[in-house]
């Protein structure tokens, strides 16, 4: 487990700063956000310090979503499992420009009980240029072929 001495989340993991811990595994720590945007807003963090998602080892990342899934069950989010029912957002930001405040990878689990609560998202979609999209697709497939055999 890599940690950083001045990182607030690393201090929470070590117990140097108190938290409202919910689930802890060998590689993941989850707790209630102390500045929530909705009731039961939870943070889920890897126990490996890294500022951005690509800095976290895969074995730590693969532990996170099962914890998120368990939390959705405990929080009883959309128990009836219908598109019309309440829902939730799972949010993860990388870098200041993408609204990351703490330089330790973290996932927000934000309940969305109704239109007035939880995360509000505006999605400014662009018009689709299919020729441009096709060229990007080919370029990305070439890049993916190069990294398929590399350790990500």
Swiss-Prot record:
Entry superkingdom: Eukaryota
Intervals of motif Histidine triad motif: 104-108
GO biological-process terms attached to the record: nucleotide metabolic process
Complex and partners: Homodimer.
Enzyme Commission numbers on file: 3.-.-.-
Function: Hydrolyzes adenosine 5'-monophosphoramidate substrates such as AMP-morpholidate, AMP-N-alanine methyl ester, AMP-alpha-acetyl lysine methyl ester and AMP-NH2.
Upregulating conditions: Expression is decreased at the stationary phase. Expression in suppressed in the presence of Pseudomonas aeruginosa lipopolysaccharide (LPS).
Residues at the catalytic site: 106
Enzymatic reactions: adenosine 5'-phosphoramidate + H2O = AMP + NH4(+)
Domain HIT, residue spans: 8-119
Cofactor: Mg(2+)
Single GO MF annotation: hydrolase activity
Protein name per UniProt: Adenosine 5'-monophosphoramidase HNT1
InterPro entries, sorted: HINT, Histidine_triad_CS, Histidine_triad_HIT, HIT-like, HIT-like_sf
Similarity comment: family membership: Belongs to the HINT family.
N-terminal signal peptide: none
Protein residues bound to AMP: 33-34, 93, 99-101, 106-108
Top-tier EC class: hydrolase
Organism: Candida albicans (strain SC5314 / ATCC MYA-2876) (Yeast)
The entry's keywords: Hydrolase, Magnesium, Nucleotide-binding
């Amino acid at each position: 487990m890599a940690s950083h001495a001045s990182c607030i989340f690393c201090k929470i993991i070590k117990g140097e700063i108190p938290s409202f811990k919910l689930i802890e595994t060998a590689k993941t720590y989850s707790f209630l956000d102390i500045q929530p945007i909705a009731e039961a807003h939870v943070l889920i963090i890897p126990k490996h310090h890294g500022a951005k998602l690509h800095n976290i080892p895969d074995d730590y990342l693969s532990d996170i979503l099962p914890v998120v899934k368990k939390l959705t069950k405990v929080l009883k989010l959309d128990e009836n499992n219908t598109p019309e029912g309440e829902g939730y957002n799972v949010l993860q930001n990388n870098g200041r420009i993408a609204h990351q405040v703490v330089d330790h990878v973290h996932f927000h689990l934000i309940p969305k009980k109704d239109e007035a609560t939880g995360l509000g998202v505006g999605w400014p979609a662009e018009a689709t240029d299919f020729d441009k999209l096709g060229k990007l697709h080919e370029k990305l497939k070439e890049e993916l072929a190069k990294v398929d055999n590399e350790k990500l």
